[in-house]
Swiss-Prot record:
InterPro entries associated with the record: CD200R, Ig-like_dom, Ig-like_dom_sf, Ig-like_fold, Ig_sub, Ig_sub2, Ig_V-set
Stored Gene3D superfamilies: Immunoglobulins (2.60.40.10)
Any one annotated GO CC term: external side of plasma membrane
Domain (Ig-like V-type) ranges: 47-146
UniProt-listed SMART domains: IG, IGc2
Residues annotated as glycosylated: 64, 67, 127, 193, 222, 228
GO biological process: regulation of neuroinflammatory response
Organism placement in taxonomy: Eukaryota, Metazoa, Chordata, Craniata, Vertebrata
Protein's recorded name: Cell surface glycoprotein CD200 receptor 1-B
Species of origin: Gallus gallus
Amino acid sequence: MEISQQAGWCKKPASPMNTRAALEAVRNTAWTIVLLTSAAVMGASGISRVSANLGHSTVMTCPNRTNISMVTWKINPKTGHQCTLAYLIDKDSTGKNSCSDRINWRSRPDWDQALEIQQVGKADEGNYTCEVVNADGNFHYLYHLTVLVAPRMALYCDDHGNPVCEAETVKPAAEISWVPESNSTPRADSHGNGTVTVVSRFAARSTNGKNPTCIVSHATLNETRSINCSSRTLAQLPGGSAP
């Protein structure tokens, strides 16, 4: 059966018998068509959940396949538009559609098809798909990216001389504990911008002469600080300021 250029790429599912013919059609098609369309998937793996710290870089890799003819990265953020990177190996040609300059190949795509995001932001959260084409068909690998934000923390004395520890995060919420152990229950307040502030007020009956110590636990940071409210001495945790 004769395969037209349009049917060969846009509509015909890839199969071991027709893959070479489909790739021949791709070579004669504009890069905009390559970037905005998707071939059928012959093989797939599960979703890998990855996380990156806000403002840092992160890398996602493609599945290891031999005799690759084309590689495509498709980015579907929770907010904003889809963007696509593509590389046609036979022609040593790359294409890019709607992607930020921060999102690009980690190195030369002819020998490293990994995707790198520089200065990761909250808007980068979402699904990332690498599609690889070779003589056996099309294969893809899925990632779900979560962006972590380090807590903003403060340790201070309230108007009654009680130690108060605060930690503000986007997600997940930080955990706060005290030494000596306090019988107070931390309060978590959610805000419209997606952040969560956890507040804990030290309420132990006795400290045995020791300064209360606040312990903040989070995926991106673990900090321990002490404070002496009997003399109203202020101690701060890095990244925060007391009111």
